[in-house]
Amino acid sequence: MSLSSGLIAAVALAYMAVMFAIAFYGDRRSTPLPPRVRAWVYSLSLAVYCTSWTFFGAVGQAAEQLWSFLPIYLGPVLLLVFAPWVLQKMVMISKQENITSIADFIAALYGKSQSLAIVVALICLVGVLPYIALQLKGIVLGVNLLIGAGADATGTRAQDTALIVSLVLALFTIVFGTRNLDSTEHHRGMVLAIAFESLVKLFAFLAVGAFVTFGLYDGFDDLFNQAMLAPRLEQYWKETVNWPSMVVQTGVAMMAIICLPRQFHVTVVENIEPQDLRLAKWVFPAYLILAALFVVCAVIGVVTVIGWVVPSS
């Protein structure tokens, strides 16, 4: 079963129109959001951490080694639950020093060294460009699967898809993200749109997980019972966990939640009130746990039925 390119384009345009409308509303709103609503919006916006890699990379990685994807989710959960004071202190320093980026933050810790800020900014640029390319590859992969093309299909269609997505994202960033660099003026529209997108992603995660669990099987018991007997998954239950690698990757993920440029911006720069972290330290870990549950159900269910997975990179 495949969908027409026209239908996919129409749905994508409609979704982007909704995102633009939400961001526009957030920017033009004359009064601030109520404190409780603001805290929920901020908490959900932290799920910008979950990108297209969550859909494809984590599932592909888990298909190769079932629990190898866990550090990506476990690191942020451990940091927020057991050391939320780290983020609280970063937010306070950011507000005191009028910080607008991770480069400014690190430079501020060393006497506001401009040369250090430039070096950090260049490192972020070099690191982020391949990462953005990977996200675009994930989007193209999704489109290819929907239209019935091969997962690794290339050519004009794939190039056009990546180009169009890049232009739309650039336009959104220019309109709602880079109009000012004053740390006292928050991008309320952009954060509201990110929070909405986080809800959409969570709904998609749960919908796929529910379809696999209750559509292909008769619930969790049936899913895991059949998985235990499936020849394709026999090696999963015999694999040994590489604990040193798991610990190192979890530590890297803990740092990623505060060092990734987009994550730093949303978590630290866009924080309006530090007390919003009190809710975020529970909401965001719960979000990641639900996303991880989706990964496990999707991998076990789909591999058991058809033995097919998406590539991990």
Question: Where do the language-model regions lie?
Answer:
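Membrane-interface "cap" regions at the ends of multi-pass membrane proteins
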Residues: 1-57, 164-190, 196, 202
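Membrane-interface helix-loop-helix modules in multi-pass membrane proteins
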Residues: 35-100, 107, 201, 212, ...
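Hydrophobic alpha-helical transmembrane segments in multi-pass membrane proteins
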Residues: 116-120, 129, 165, 201-210, ...
